[in-house]
A protein has these predicted regions:
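Conserved alpha/beta core of the MobA/IspD/sugar-nucleotide pyrophosphorylase nucleotidyltransferase superfamily
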Residues: 203-277
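Cysteine-centered motifs
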Residues: 10-13
Length: 277
């Protein structure tokens, strides 16, 4: 296998080609699935109201996310909108927008609503749920989130990245995943998620990235479940799936993407994306 430029990122595992040992067993993640990417978006963010329409380098944030999802080339991309003003912004950028019930309690409920409106015939068997506040997300990470679904034992897939500092490990805002990767493994089962430091003891810690790939039946089952005790305690929706016996597989990627949750985050995104626009 010839050695490409080390700055090029592999479409399948989201690691640089310079680490050749990771790539010799790859097959395209999407060969056996027909994904659709859905981006839930609403105006009512608590910490940064209306952030999905915040201007970044001349475009609403949701449009940056839309363009990066399209760049992945995995399949159709649509925004599941809670309000018409978001739909208008998406359509003005040439995107597909679906108006959903503004009262949905979660992004998972919103994308399931949009899925049934867009694809009532069930053509798409995998649904990628991409957050609308990740304006610099690498399209390669959307390929990476499909990797666990190569194993039929997993119902849901998501991503983790290494925790790289003590500050990150202690941060309540950083969700940690209890998982362990064997030598050479890129996928592992998720055993628990917490805002606290898990697991205890020496060893790697993993920062959960809230991008999910659901098998269609798993998404339907998940949204039909009532909120679970640990979900309510930790305020982490994915624990509902684990408590119900569903299996979540995690793929590891090099670093957590930058998310916009505060005004300071927004200003940083404007500086970074403005520089490259």
């Amino acid at each position: 296998m010839p050695k490409p430029d080390p700055l090029v990122i592999c479409r399948n595992c989201a690691y640089p080609y310079s680490d050749l040992g990771r790539h010799d067993k790859h097959q395209r993640d999407s060969d056996n699935v027909t994904p659709i990417i859905l981006i839930p978006a609403r105006m009512g963010s608590t910490r940064l109201p209306d952030k999905v329409l915040a201007d970044i380098a001349g475009l609403p944030m949701i449009v940056h996310v839309l363009e990066r999802a399209r760049a992945a080339g995995l399949g159709p991309v649509a925004v599941a909108c809670g309000e018409a003003v978001i739909a208008r912004a998406v359509e003005a950028a040439g995107g597909v927008a679906v108006l959903t019930d503004p009262g949905h309690p979660s992004g998972s409920d919103r994308i399931f609503d949009a899925l049934n409106l867009l694809d009532p015939g069930g053509v798409h068997d995998v649904i990628i749920n991409l957050q609308g506040d990740l304006p610099s997300i690498s399209p390669e990470y959307l390929h990476a989130v499909l990797r666990p679904l190569a194993d039929p034992a997993y119902d849901i897939a998501t991503l983790v990245a290494p925790v790289t500092s003590e500050e990150e490990a202690k941060a309540h805002s950083v969700v940690k995943c209890a998982c362990a990767f064997g030598e050479g493994q890129e996928v592992a089962p998720a055993l628990y998620f917490s805002r606290n430091r898990v697991p205890s003891g020496a060893g790697a810690l993993w920062h959960h990235i809230g991008i999910y790939a659901y098998r269609r039946a798993a998404l339907a089952r998940f949204v039909a479940l009532a909120p679970s005790p640990l979900e309510l305690r930790e305020k982490l929706e994915q624990l509902r799936a684990l408590e119900a016996g569903m299996r979540i597989g995690v793929a590891r990627v090099p670093a957590a993407p930058f998310g916009v949750d505060t005004q300071a985050d927004l200003e940083l995104a404007r500086r970074n994306l403005g520089h490259y626009s």
